[in-house]
Regions:
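Electropositive, glycine- and tryptophan-enriched low-complexity nucleic-acid-binding patches
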Residues: 1-30, 111
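Short, surface-exposed basic-aromatic patches at helix termini and helix-loop junctions that form
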Residues: 23-28, 47-56
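Short active-site oxyanion
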Residues: 32-34
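Acidic, metal-coordinating catalytic cores used for nucleic-acid/nucleotide bond scission
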Residues: 36-44, 63-65
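A short, flexible helix-boundary coil/loop motif
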Residues: 73-101, 146, 165-230
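Short, solvent-exposed helix-loop connector elements
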Residues: 122-131, 143-163, 180-184
Length: 230
């Protein structure tokens, strides 16, 4: 579900964007345990704000530098946690996760991932596993692109509005599937995803629009059909 979006103006600080989204969640009375942020929010002002707010968070940290910087922490064979001070003087606790990923030839090579950890006692593997779940957000964006309206207009407000409508449609599908595709069984609620896939939802939307506005079944042409039909 997408609970809040923010129209980012040129030059707007990332901390302002984050505070706007968090205030919207507060209005909705939505509570959460841990905040997961991508690399764009790995800034000193955001770290200070979350630390002072005592908000548990995991933030992806870019690995920079050739030998120094956070790249100097990419040593050894095992994952670990360590304290680190950024160039702007902001202290942070980092989880350095060593992963093995295959290259083009199929050989597995070591790849380091860095996460800024705030008010969490978790081990590195738990941090890595929980943050990976965040990639489900990307799936909602891919679904949104299937139902958003497309335009050649360069008006950013119009584009933002169409994006918002697409996200509302995805939220609608999530709600309908949660209510009508659930399994009737004791215990916690489970959903059978095969009963109402997103593709079927989009087909139903198309049919509803065609029923409301009609559909085009022919085109004007100056060529007789008999001349091209054999």
């Amino acid at each position: 579900l997408t609970l809040a979006i923010h129209y980012v103006l040129p030059g707007e600080e990332k901390l302002t964007v984050l505070q706007s989204l968090l205030s919207r969640l507060k209005i909705l009375n939505f509570t959460f345990g841990v905040l997961y942020l991508d690399k764009a929010f790995a800034a000193g002002s955001i770290l200070d704000y979350l630390t002072q707010s005592e908000q548990p968070a995991v933030i992806a940290c870019p690995i920079r530098g050739k030998r120094g910087g956070t790249r100097a922490l990419c040593q050894g064979r095992k994952s670990y946690r360590t304290d680190y001070t950024f160039t702007d003087g902001t202290p942070a606790n980092l989880a350095m996760v060593a992963t093995l990923v295959p290259n083009k030839s199929g050989k597995r090579r070591r790849k380091w991932l860095a996460y800024i950890v705030i008010h969490l006692p978790w081990k590195t593997q738990k941090i890595y596993g929980r943050y990976r779940r965040r990639f489900g957000i990307e799936c909602s964006y891919r679904s949104m692109r299937q139902v958003r309206a497309h335009t050649t207009s360069r008006n950013p407000a119009l584009r933002f509005f169409q994006l918002a409508v697409g996200l509302v449609l995805v939220n609608t599908w999530v709600f309908l599937r949660w209510e009508f595709a659930r399994l009737i069984a004791p215990g916690p609620r489970w959903v059978d995803p095969r009963r109402f896939r997103f593709h079927r939802f989009t087909r139903l939307l198309i049919r509803a629009v065609e029923k409301l506005y009609g559909s085009v079944m022919s085109i004007q042409t100056q060529v007789l059909p008999e001349s091209v039909i054999y």
